[in-house]
Amino acid sequence: MEKIDLNKIYKRKKSDRDIFQELMPFKVKEILLIANYYDSYTIEREGQFSGKIFGEYLQLNLFAAPRFTSVANEEGALHELKKRHFDLIIIMAGLDKETPILTSRHIKELYPDICQLMLVNNNADLSYLLSSEKEISESIERVFVWNGSTKVFLAMAKYLEDKINLEADTKLG
C-alpha cells in the first residue's frame, strides 16, 4: 500500500486556496451612474434596484456589491467626482445621444483613468452609436444595452474587473 503524505496534500490545498484569494485583486466598489430623470426612473421602476443588484451578486457568491451614486447630468457628475473616487462611470444615453457623448468627453479630459461605459435603451440606439464609433471611442470604452434587467450592471462591473485583473490573474492561476 502506498504511503500518503498528508502534510504534502495540506500544503497543496492551502496553496490553491491562497492563490484563489489573490485572484481578482481589483474589485469595482464605487459606480457613478449618470442618467436623466426619466431613465433613472425607468431603471428604478423595474424593481428594487439596490436589492436586485445585491441579489445578483449573492447568486454568484460575491458578497460585496458596488455602491451606486446616481446623478442626472454632467454638473452633478463633476460635483460627485470632486468628492470621492469612482471605479466606474456608467452614462445612460436616452433619447438625447449627443449630451451623454459630450459629457463623457468632458469627464475623460478631467479624469482620464476612470473607465466610462455607456448604457443605451435598445438595439436601435446601439446601431446609432456604433455608426459613430470613432466619435465615442475616445471616451467611452464599451456600449451595453439596457434590457430591463439589473444583470447588465453586474456585467459592466465584471467587464472592468476582468479587464484590469487579466494580467495578474493569468500569472497567478
Model-derived features with residue positions:
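Non-catalytic signal-transmission and effector/linker regions of two-component phosphorelay proteins
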Residues: M1-R67, D87, S149-G173
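A general structural signal for stabilizing positions within well-ordered secondary structure
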Residues: E22, Q59-L60, E80, K108, ...
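Short glycine-/polar-rich loops that comprise or flank the Walker A/P-loop
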Residues: V28-K29, D113-I114, I140
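Structural signal for conserved beta-strand scaffold positions within catalytic alpha/beta enzyme cores
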Residues: L33, S70, M118, F144-V145
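Conserved phosphotransfer microenvironments
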Residues: T42-R45, G51-F54, A65, S70-L78, ...
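Conserved catalytic or regulatory cores that recognize and/or transform ribose-phosphate-containing ligands
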Residues: L126-Y128, E135, D162, T170
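As written
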Residues: L130-G148
